[in-house]
Amino acid sequence: MLTPIIRKFQYGQHTVTIETGMMARQATAAVMVSMDDTAVFVTVVGQKKAKPGQSFFPLTVNYQERTYAAGRIPGSFFRREGRPSEGETLTSRLIDRPIRPLFPDSFLNEVQVIATVVSVNPQINPDIVALIGASAVLSLSGIPFNGPIGAARVGFINDQYVLNPTTDELKESRLDLVVAGTAGAVLMVESEADILSEEQMLGAVVFGHEQQQVVIENINALVAEAGKPKWDWQAEPVNEALHARVAELAEARLGDAYRITEKQERYTQVDAIKADVTEALLAQDDTLDAAEIQDILASVEKNVVRSRVLRGEPRIDGREKDMIRGLDVRTGILPRTHGSALFTRGETQALVTATLGTARDAQNIDELMGERTDSFLLHYNFPPYCVGETGMVGSPKRREIGHGRLAKRGVLAVMPSASEFPYTIRVVSEITESNGSSSMASVCGASLALMDAGVPIKAAVAGIAMGLVKEGDNFVVLSDILGDEDHLGDMDFKVAGSRDGVTALQMDIKIEGITREIMQVALNQAKGARLHILGVMEQAISTPRGDISEFAPRIYTMKINPEKIKDVIGKGGSVIRALTDETGTTIEIEDDGTIKIAATDGDKAKHAIRRIEEITAEIEVGRIYAGKVTRIVDFGAFVAIGGGKEGLVHISQIADKRVEKVTDYLQMGQDVPVKVMEVDRQGRIRLSIKEATTPDAEAPEAAAE
């Protein structure tokens, strides 16, 4: 008989339940975690042995949403879930980032975490539930893991922090921040904010970390009751003698190599040193393992760079700890794009474009939480040439999706509302060179390109990546880190914002012991760097251009009586299709009668407006119109009087005398004046030619189209 073991606790305004022992008993561990009807089933499987020759930790995290969780059937052709959506990919990364640093450095066994959303309450985002589940299964599994971790979402409403706000509450919140960490340290932060101060952001991180302690306590209690035995795994002992020999041969040479400021030249020199040392040691003793020598070389290399920083010496490229690399900022460099910018910071460079489209260009997103439309898109591309490599070129990888989302978070707070600027906007960042923080270069480039496109953003935004080197109580925070400093350091801390505050904060920490003091230093140092970059950007362009590009569609707005919408659309869309073909414009109609006309030519837009005014104009009884015969029948003729309206001239209303045959007086396409005699309740129009041709009749009002 299956007997589940359950922990239930209050987490802010929600009740969380963690259950194990009922399902997936062949997995290493499995839990069902629920928070107010949002339930995520999380499993972990770990291989007992590492693959021979394995050189990295093969951790895989898959987060997947099932449409049955929301009581729906997939809308795809095959009626089943397909490749991961962008949201699923981002949540997979969100889970991966805080758990990866908690595995031992030398643990190389394959581990796979799968989180499946099986029930969803639209008010509760499953990502926090999935994070709690991943922490619980790894803690229960016995796999070497220095957890558990907790996770929390923090909102900021009416100047108060809110723990795990609902979907509706988030709409009113100036902050959407996710924080994860162990009992003693924050490990990961992901956030977007509506221009909050550094103090408010830091307060949110600390608040979330304090509140999530209840999660850690309950997971520990569950492990005590249902946890599996710890694996009998021991790290391979360090070969101290070999380590000393490698350090003796390589340390000084690597120190010299890391004084080379140009990245590719430095890499070439470092690779040559490693090859020389490996060859020399193998020549002395062919029983040595080349892979082990390479691992020790990597350790020596890391120590060389870190110790220099901690001693206060210049960094790899000769900078002091708070110096920003040289900046080059240019706008309007691509003649036919709607907006463009080239942002260069040292050896990191982004070519960024902004394209304006209409509402029909917006992205329709069908998520588990419901359907929504996104009119601001930001895409990030990282081709292999940007780091001097060859490789596959194709659909975006997880990293590109994640970096694009971070850059979008950085810009989102300053974007105009749809009523202020009724365009769909797509920003694309092409990374043409990379040596540290290309995502923050994308934020800077996006701000510049949007201004160049004439998008009325509220303020310029810039981003900067901070790093950390920490040994014991000694630490140094680095501004504008290089790729090597990111790889060899203890923290990747990215901040984007305007002169007035922070718009996005992302933090990934590889060690425990990051204190509030360190985060405060990093935020303050990042603010200084951000303001410096903004100053340089403002020299290139300080405010959005006064007009959009001549190649961008211009949107003209007009309002009609909602009851006339059917007239503009026509039967089966016939009228609006004819209008767009005739005028060469794009026409969009909203339910309240608002019509948006997009055109690259102002005359075409004016023509479309005039035609819509004709179609929606009220027909006045007693007024004479210029008409055109469109159909002839035995009992009269149908005459178009403009604006897509047509009326009947009865045979008795054609002439003052008796008419035996309509075609004796009228022909198809003939222009005739007609007087409106009546418009009945069904909108049918009765016309008269003879009343319009009396001597005292007024002149026709307008020619028929």
From Swiss-Prot:
Location of the protein in the cell: Cytoplasm
Main location: cytoplasm
Domain S1 motif span(s) in chain numbering: 622-690
Catalytic activity: RNA(n+1) + phosphate = RNA(n) + a ribonucleoside 5'-diphosphate
Stretches assigned to the KH domain: 553-612
EC number(s) recorded for this UniProt protein: 2.7.7.8
Annotated GO CC locations: cytosol
Molecular function in Gene Ontology: 3'-5'-RNA exonuclease activity; magnesium ion binding; polyribonucleotide nucleotidyltransferase activity; RNA binding
InterPro entries in the cross-refs: ExoRNase_PH_dom1 (IPR001247), ExoRNase_PH_dom2 (IPR015847), ExoRNase_PH_dom2_sf (IPR036345), KH_dom (IPR004087), KH_dom_type_1 (IPR004088), KH_dom_type_1_sf (IPR036612), NA-bd_OB-fold (IPR012340), PNPase (IPR012162)
Any single GO BP term: mRNA catabolic process
Enzyme class of the recorded protein, top EC level: transferase
Keywords, alphabetical: Cytoplasm, Magnesium, Metal-binding, Nucleotidyltransferase, RNA-binding, Transferase
SMART domains: KH, S1
Cofactors required: Mg(2+)
Residues at which Mg(2+) binds: 486, 492
Source taxon at top rank: Bacteria
Record carries keyword Metal-binding: yes
Quaternary data: Component of the RNA degradosome, which is a multiprotein complex involved in RNA processing and mRNA degradation.
Family indicated by similarity: Belongs to the polyribonucleotide nucleotidyltransferase family.
The protein's role, per its UniProt record: Involved in mRNA degradation. Catalyzes the phosphorolysis of single-stranded polyribonucleotides processively in the 3'- to 5'-direction.
The protein, known as: Polyribonucleotide nucleotidyltransferase
Species per Swiss-Prot/TrEMBL record: Yersinia pestis bv. Antiqua (strain Nepal516)
Source lineage: Bacteria, Pseudomonadati, Pseudomonadota, Gammaproteobacteria, Enterobacterales
Gene: pnp
